[in-house]
């Protein structure tokens, strides 16, 4: 018995020291530490920008609120993540990623000023959405560059852990940015003037991200000039980005399996997002209250994703990427059924649990791309992931918006989401089985 007690004490101390050990590992990698700081500043700005626009577009009585209008707003806000992904990947695999970060953040500052001005003068939805479209496109370049650069600043054996640290830090920053939006909205109102002030505030974290991007040396973030790199003109590299990325995905079953599971999760996220937005608009008379309830749901989902960032590295080491992702997809299919009653408190809890499961699937896919793909093509593959990530999301929202009633009471769509998870599990199981064992799997 004493031997067991001593073992338990040692085991507990090891777990207690784990965060300290991770922190020391982060600080021992100076370039990763700098990259992490850029991510934190950039994603705080992203969260603030997206929440400010959501308040202006979706919780403003002077603007559209029906399901198709909500779907259209989401499509415009996130279209850059799907359309520009292949081009971002091609440029990142050809240009110094430091200058991609610098250039994209500089462009973001200009667009932030433009969008803030559009809101300040009370212009219509079209110029506002066009400005948001371009601003989000530039934000996509930054996010893709940060992900593709990570293996350059982290030893291979630490990629999974440090990727989780990076994603967790970014998620927390985006969450804080989105919730910080509530303060100026409360002080200045929920109209266009308040939204304009929020957008102008985004310039602060983006400026910090820009300045911190300048601290890297030439080619520190990649890409490598390997023999597999795509040569020729820059135009050729941009145009062929998606083709090369897709071909690489097809050739690597571990990557293809991960992306299939991720696509299934994103389709369900789209359905659930539309349902919760319609439900809170229907049951809450005040737009501010509706926005707060919606933010609570998305915050719970983000908190679940944060927890997954902590748990996933251990799960992958114990069971491998393949089994871990399969388990997460199976759990998600079960959790989704519990939300069929469309009770908002229950949906918030399910959102938290689905945030855990979905982020586990994404991290498994990320580790496959970061460890199984040559650096010269990694940016292209991440671009394919970005495109799939957002196309599946936008398509599911659009299809659901055409069928879901305005009050949002459509439990059959919740059950359909569970079926999508099961389909993703089947595809992941079949495709992933073809993959050859690799280090870290």
From Swiss-Prot:
Q: Per its UniProt entry, which superkingdom is the organism in?
A: Bacteria
Q: Which Pfam families match?
A: MFS_1
Q: How does this chain sit within the bilayer?
A: Multi-pass membrane protein
Keywords of the record, alphabetical order, are: Cell membrane, Membrane, Transmembrane, Transmembrane helix, Transport
Q: Which organism is it from?
A: Mycobacterium tuberculosis (strain CDC 1551 / Oshkosh)
The places in or outside the cell where this protein is found are:
Cell membrane
Q: Which parts of the chain span the membrane according to its record? A: 68-88, 110-130, 131-151, 164-184, 194-214, 229-246, 260-280, 287-307, 337-357, 384-404, 412-432
Family assignment?
A: Belongs to the major facilitator superfamily.
Assigned GO CC terms? plasma membrane
Query: From which lineage does this chain's organism come?
Result: Bacteria, Bacillati, Actinomycetota, Actinomycetes, Mycobacteriales
Question: Which residues form each disulfide bond in the chain?
Answer: none
Specify where it is mainly localized.
membrane
Name of the featured protein: Uncharacterized MFS-type transporter MT0042
Q: In its keyword annotation, does this UniProt entry include Transport?
A: yes
């Amino acid at each position: 018995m004493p031997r067991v007690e001593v073992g338990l004490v040692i085991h507990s101390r090891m777990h207690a020291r784990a965060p300290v050990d991770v922190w020391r590992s982060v600080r021992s990698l100076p370039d990763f530490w700098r990259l992490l700081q850029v991510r934190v500043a950039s994603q705080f700005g992203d969260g603030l920008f997206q929440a400010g626009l959501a308040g202006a577009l979706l919780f403003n009585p002077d603007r559209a609120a029906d399901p198709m209008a909500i779907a259209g707003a989401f499509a415009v806000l996130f279209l850059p993540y799907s359309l520009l992904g292949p081009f971002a990947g091609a440029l990142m695999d050809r240009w110094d990623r430091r200058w991609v970060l610098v250039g994209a953040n500089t462009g973001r500052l200009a667009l932030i000023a433009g969008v803030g001005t559009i809101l300040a003068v009370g212009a219509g939805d079209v110029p506002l959405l066009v400005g948001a479209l371009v601003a989000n496109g530039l934000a996509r370049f930054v996010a893709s560059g940060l992900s593709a650069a990570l293996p350059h600043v982290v030893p291979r054996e630490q990629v999974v852990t440090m990727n989780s640290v990076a994603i967790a830090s970014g998620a927390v920053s985006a969450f804080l940015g989105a919730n910080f939006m509530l303060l100026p909205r409360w002080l200045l109102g929920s109209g266009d003037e308040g939204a304009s002030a929020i957008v102008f505030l985004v310039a602060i974290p983006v400026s910090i991200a820009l300045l911190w991007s300048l601290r890297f040396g030439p080619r520190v973030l990649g890409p490598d000039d390997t023999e597999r790199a795509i040569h020729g003109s820059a135009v050729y590299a941009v145009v062929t980005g998606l083709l090369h990325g897709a071909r690489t995905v097809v050739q690597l079953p571990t990557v293809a399996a991960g992306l299939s599971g991720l696509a299934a999760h994103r389709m369900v996220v789209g359905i659930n997002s539309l349902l919760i937005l319609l439900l809170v608009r229907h049951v809450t008379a005040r737009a501010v209250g509706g926005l707060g309830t919606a933010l609570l749901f998305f915050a719970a989902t983000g908190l679940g994703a944060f927890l997954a960032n902590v748990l996933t590295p251990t799960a992958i080491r114990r069971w491998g990427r393949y089994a871990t992702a399969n388990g997460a997809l199976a759990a998600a299919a079960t959790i989704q059924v519990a939300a069929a009653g469309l009770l908002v408190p229950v949906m918030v809890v399910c959102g938290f649990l689905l945030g855990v499961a979905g982020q586990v699937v994404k991290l498994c896919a990320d580790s496959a791309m970061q460890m199984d793909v040559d650096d010269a093509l990694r940016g292209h593959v991440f671009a394919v992931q970005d495109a799939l990530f957002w196309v599946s999301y936008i398509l599911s929202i659009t299809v659901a918006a055409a069928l879901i009633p305005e009050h949002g009471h459509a439990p059959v769509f919740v059950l359909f989401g569970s079926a999508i998870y099961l389909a993703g599990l089947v595809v992941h199981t079949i495709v992933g089985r073809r993959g050859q064992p690799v280090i870290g799997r």
